Structure formats: C-alpha cells, structure tokens
Amino acid sequence: MLDKRIMMADKQQNNYQLVRNNIDNIFSVSGAADCKTLEGVFASKVEAEKENTEALNKIIRVFRMAGCKESDVYSTASIYSHKLNPTAQTAEGCAQRAIKQEKYTEALAFYDEALQLEEIDSLKYDYAYAKAAILRQLGRYAEARSAAYQAISFNGKEGEPYILIATMYADSNPFGDDKILAKTVYWAAVDKLEKAKSVDPACSEAAQKLISAYRQHYPSKEDVFFKPELKPGTMFHIGGWMNEDVRCRD
C-alpha cells in the first residue's frame, strides 16, 4: 500500500512538472512573450526571489526561450542565481550584463566559466564564438582566432567563425611598408571564406560578398612582376600572428 502511494505521488509530481514546463513553453513562444512584456511581468519577481535559485532559474529559462537574453531582467536574474549556484546559463547571463557595461574582460571570464560548466557542444559553440567576437573587437586577433577555432571544434558545420577569421586577416598587415606583400592577406582571407561556404551553405551569400570585395585587392600582374615570389601557383608564407601558407593566384 505504501509503495503504491509513493508511486502515485511520484506520478502526480511528474504530471505537475510536465504541466509547468508546458506553461513555460507556451508562454515563451506566444505573442504575449515579447521582451518588454516579460520584463514587466518578471522585474519585481526577480528582486523578490533573489535568494531562490529555483524561481530565478525558471525566470532565466523563460527569457532564454523567448530570445530575450539582452534583457536587463534576464541578466539580473542570472547574476543573482550565479551567486547562489553557478551554471553555464547563469555565467552567460552575467557575460551579457558585462558586455552591456563594456566590461569585456569580465565578459570573457564569464564565457570561460560557461565553457567549463557546459556539457552540450552546441552551447559551447555559442560561448566560444561569443569570446571570439569580443576578442576581435578588442583587436586581440590571435586570441580571437584561437577562440574561433575552439568554436569550430564544438560545431564544425558553422561558417561564421571562418568569416570572423577572414575579416581579421583582411584587416591585418604583417608586412609593414611593403604595400605589395600586404595584399597577400586577402588570399588568406578568401581561403577562410571559401571554407565557410563549404561547411555552411547558410552563410554562402555573406561569404561571397566578402570574397568579391577582397578579390579586388589581390596583387596585380604588375605587382607580381616586381615580386616574382608571388607567381601564381606557388606557395607563399604570411608571417606574424597569421602564420599562414597561401597559394598565390591572379
């Protein structure tokens, strides 16, 4: 009899949890769940429940499902929850707040923490790519490339990390005053863009636009006359932080 009651209680608890999850899902994906509406509903609740991990995580879940991760309410709930019980999701929320405050070093630290706590590769990809984007903005290109490759290691079917690397290559000049050799970075950039197209058809259009633009800056035939080491078909090494071998081309 006791076992039967326990089984019935467990079943009721499971049913309750299922209903609650369904309510969260419906609310988050419905038209009523725009970010401003969610902020109006949950702003006061976050403060009232700032010591309640379960309540805070429920609020965080609703905001994530509604795509409202830039909301102040979301990041505030994340900060409170992170102090109580750090998770990858709360670390990301803390990173979002740091970014809005332009505290990029803090944001990078939170994304590192999220990467350590997360077990799902698709989410690890998001955190690593976010790191790469921040580092690129800070001009820390070598670190940004490392973070981009880290993102690729978690999801090799995404082209955005390759595009990010390409834009950094195109923005670099490891050759000082040598304006002809400086053009070779565009070969390296296009190589990454072609890779982006090959792994991710969804980014083909964006990659192709950059390819068309970068090709305009390739070394000309006249340039090659003065720099025979750039003869089409030969390999050329680009040093500095890039450290890439590229095939010379027209």
Where are these regions (language model features)?
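TPR/TPR-like (Sel1-like) alpha-helical repeat modules
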Residues: 1-8, 145, 149-153, 181-205, ...
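Residue-level recognition of tetratricopeptide repeat
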Residues: 96-97, 129, 133, 160, ...
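Solenoid-like repeat scaffolds
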Residues: 43-50, 78-86, 113-121, 150-156
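Terminal, low-structured helical/coil segments at or just beyond the last alpha-helical repeat
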Residues: 195-250
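Short coil/turn linking the two alpha-helices of tandem helical-hairpin repeats
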Residues: 67, 119-122, 136-139, 166, ...
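Generic helix N-cap/helix-start motif at coil->alpha-helix transitions
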Residues: 1-2, 12-23, 34-38, 46-59, ...
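Structural register within alpha-helical repeat arrays
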Residues: 58-63, 77, 94, 130-131, ...
